[in-house]
Curated annotation (Swiss-Prot):
Presence of keyword Isomerase: yes
Alphabetical list of InterPro entries matching this protein: IF-2B-related, IF_2B-like_C, Initiation_fac_2B_a/b/d, M1Pi_N, NagB/RpiA_transferase-like, R15Pi
Pfam assignment, any one: IF-2B
A GO term for molecular function: ribose 1,5-bisphosphate isomerase activity
Family in the record: Belongs to the eIF-2B alpha/beta/delta subunits family. R15P isomerase subfamily.
Name of this chain's protein: Ribose 1,5-bisphosphate isomerase
SUPFAM superfamilies documented for this protein: NagB/RpiA/CoA transferase-like
Coiled-coil blocks: none
Induction and repression of expression: Up-regulated by nucleosides (at protein level).
Summary of subunit composition and partner proteins: Homohexamer; trimer of dimers.
Protein keywords: Carbohydrate metabolism, Isomerase
Active site: 133, 202
Amino acid sequence: MAVVKEVLEIAEKIKNMEIRGAGKIARSAAYALQLQAEKSKATNVDEFWKEMKQAAKILFETRPTAVSLPNALRYVMHRGKIAYSSGADLEQLRFVIINAAKEFIHNSEKALERIGEFGAKRIEDGDVIMTHCHSKAAISVMKTAWEQGKDIKVIVTETRPKWQGKITAKELASYGIPVIYVVDSAARHYMKMTDKVVMGADSITVNGAVINKIGTALIALTAKEHRVWTMIAAETYKFHPETMLGQLVEIEMRDPTEVIPEDELKTWPKNIEVWNPAFDVTPPEYVDVIITERGIIPPYAAIDILREEFGWALKYTEPWED
């Protein structure tokens, strides 16, 4: 029983943030399961299913906050579990896993297009938009609005300590969109010239709270103070089913050396601690709308999305744990 090296490589890249962004993480996880199914040397269906569960568990343990990862695994593995429990043979189960992974990736990519279409309707000609971190869903909204001929400008925060704002700024600029790049702490200063805030999400809870890159909550709060609309762009697979049962979302704490270089940190007094949370929680009252591939909803409607999309998931143990 063996997990193929490509799965281990993808898991490591997710863990060390070479693969970043909730959507890309989810698609990469689904693709890893596809590779495991395609490359498995298992000689019988039981051995194959054990390998699939082991691969899914390794992927699951890489990042604790972004719910897109376990939701992608659930999508693929739940379909595999049904086939396995129904008596599928090795090749039948392999086919189900591969097809489920491809289907998830396809649906995820189409969701970005739909989010762009819905979100662009809320962007007006001449808008100055502020964004934070790097979200393909948020970028889709701005890119679609620009392609529709709307004259927009985007303020991009740098997003310390991993500088995801640089990725966003360069991507938006590559589409021809005018970009203003600012330090995170300048967000409030420039909010007075901002018309809309558009950001992504790593997870959305049952009450509509948004878990996203650290700094998101401060920008949303500042926007509320200035009466600027905050719009969160997120695929439905970023909604967190376990929060329906009262589970809290774990906020990932990352290595202090992402903030202070290791050599410098060694010279600091021992009574200084460096804390590096990767995410924060934006209360639903700071969010005006959530843009999904199913349409634009208010935060309090998150529970409806969860019931419809993931109600089934609450009835079963995780398909990689049984």
